[in-house]
């Protein structure tokens, strides 16, 4: 009997999302986002799924949030209490920005441009970090770490790339821009990216010592200061990390 019950639970979790209760339009957008089963919904969460639908351009109301939450728990929307709905709305208001990110192949292409910049840093004896700013599918700025050369602690790749992009656009606010960077941003750079109102930040390798996108702190998840910028990582992570490791290995090799 326990095995049969376990089978039923697993079967229910993997049940395909259907209409009703979801509308055909919502269902189609969820499929485009790769959210097709109750397991997908439970893994991502009703609130983030709701925000992804909005980020994908779907016009939805609170009733869709109730439907998603109910589906994730295997109950009917009308079974949600008013207290549960109030909690959901509070969590929705506090949730960090969510975005639909480009296809992996597209993100990898732009990250390679950032990697080319990072290689220039390495060649100059600087810590190899590179960044690229993309708007409407085109690179409008690219830069690398030049702290030693410029004798300026603020000359991280992201800061220089933001300055270049601001000059190109004639505005320090980079609405609709994406920033690709080979290493998880530090607190200084994360703050600058948020203040520039960058739409999406895509980084390569995480930085366990100073990373401010989840490693030691997550500024992007601080709703009070971040209302515009979504973040994701791990794009060409191996290549980005290898470049850093090779740089420090060579540096130790030639130290007296």
Regions found by a protein language model. Give the residues of each.
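A structural microfeature
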Residues: 141-143
């Amino acid at each position: 009997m326990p095995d049969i019950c376990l089978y039923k639970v697993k079967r229910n979790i993997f049940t395909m999302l259907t209409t009703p209760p979801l509308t055909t339009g919502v269902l189609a957008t969820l499929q485009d986002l790769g959210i097709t089963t109750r397991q997908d919904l439970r893994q991502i969460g009703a609130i983030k799924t709701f925000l992804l639908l909005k980020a994908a351009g779907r016009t939805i109301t609170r009733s869709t949030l109730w439907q998603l939450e109910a589906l994730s728990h295997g109950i009917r929307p009308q079974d949600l209490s008013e207290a549960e709905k109030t909690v959901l709305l509070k969590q929705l208001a506090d949730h960090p920005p969510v975005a639909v990110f480009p296809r992996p192949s597209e993100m990898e292409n732009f990250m390679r441009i950032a990697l080319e910049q990072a290689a220039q840093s390495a060649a100059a004896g600087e810590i190899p970090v590179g960044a690229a700013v993309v708007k409407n599918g085109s690179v409008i700025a690219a830069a690398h770490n030049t702290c030693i050369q410029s004798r300026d602690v603020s000359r991280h790749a992201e800061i220089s790339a933001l300055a270049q992009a601001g000059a190109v656009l004639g505005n320090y606010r980079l609405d609709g821009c994406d920033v690709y960077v080979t290493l998880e941003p530090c607190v200084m750079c994360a703050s600058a990216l948020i203040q520039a109102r960058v739409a999406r930040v895509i980084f390569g390798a995480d930085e366990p010592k100073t990373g401010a996108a989840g490693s030691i702190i997550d500024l992007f998840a601080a709703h009070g200061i971040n209302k515009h910028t979504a973040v994701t990582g791990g794009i060409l992570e191996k290549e980005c990390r290898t470049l850093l490791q090779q740089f420090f290995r060579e540096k130790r090799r030639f130290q007296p």
